[in-house]
């Protein structure tokens, strides 16, 4: 109908909102036509394997700099607070780009968007290995471009998995996918440190990654499909029929989704702690080793730091075990306990806080105990990665998931790990400036700057307790086969049934 001449838009089909008025002077928005789509199970698992491999490389890129941080500080002559700014620039560019990629992922080819991101971050990473010490600002800029490329993948890949699998299958696949967060982080430390030791030059660590990323790009193009949005929930029919919503309407819907809001704040607390620990823990452990007299201080590159290898191996081991334990606990208990997923997240974060505190305060006394409690804290923290992703996919309607992922990434990073490495380094530098210059005082300054992490992670546990109050309601709304803008789901289901707007209990949509 042209020019808004008709009083009502045509009904989009069974289960749709019937006879919506477009308003004066406005055209009817184009309906989302369901398209039949199917994929053999083995193809879905192959696609998931490729996405997991790329996620591994993604997180290796995040933390490879931390594995060679001492060398970078020596080459570019930067202090702790400016070194923390490296990660802050990376994460800031990631969070600024995430809403853009979330918007594109909800409306355009997700496969093409991810491919562009891989090209961007691999090219910037390779270029950064050739930057002269005179142009330290250019090195910071290159890390920002790597963060921009990484945003495309972090935002879109979970939504593709959400459209390939459903229910228990999706929980298990997400568990495997998110295992590669700690595995990739740990391998980033290991690769950076090991390549530096083998070649005597930290720059080669940044030149190895683009080769692996070229393979990832080819596999993505050849083996990963771009399923219709909501395909898993609608038995291959694609997105639930209805009208396309604007980005502002999507954001307004998500702002009313309290499970999403509180879980996002919980993820923010996790990001704050993992960002600070991931960037500074290897240096903290090295300085503890120097204080204990187990290793001499480093005066020139290459700096030998066995703690990068140890912390990397610890991150991998605790990450794999933690993600599996968290996902399996969620899969089992959500069938018998309402709101089990956020309760699992809350319990693990509240238990992480004392572990981190003990790891910090015991480091000057016994390095072994510090490692034990640090490993236990990382294990408990890792229990949440797959679970929080499953919470998001279960409480958000399919056509808004890309935007939801983007907003969660943006908020989580802007209030979390965008500032925590810089803030930790800044506090350390301020404390050190007021004390005599000694290795013990350097260590104590960094130790005390870490203490805020234990408090922040406890706040995150409280946010997940609040998530549990709203989870069942928001899950029910997300599974309602309602069309129109996402805000139309914000209606009581009994009222919808009385109005004849629900077509039945099934999630599939049929063409009229």
Curated annotation (Swiss-Prot):
Residues 1-30, 481-512 are annotated as: Disordered. GO terms for biological process: lipid transport. GO terms for molecular function: transmembrane transporter activity. Its main location: membrane. It comes from the Eukaryota. It is a multi-pass membrane protein. The keyword Cell cycle does not apply. InterPro entries: MFS, MFS_dom, MFS_spinster-like, MFS_trans_sf. The chain crosses the membrane at residues 50-70, 84-104, 112-132, 145-165, 173-193, 204-224, 260-280, 309-329, 343-365, 377-397, 411-431, 450-470. It is found in: Membrane. Sphingolipid transporter. This is Protein spinster homolog 3. It comes from Homo sapiens.
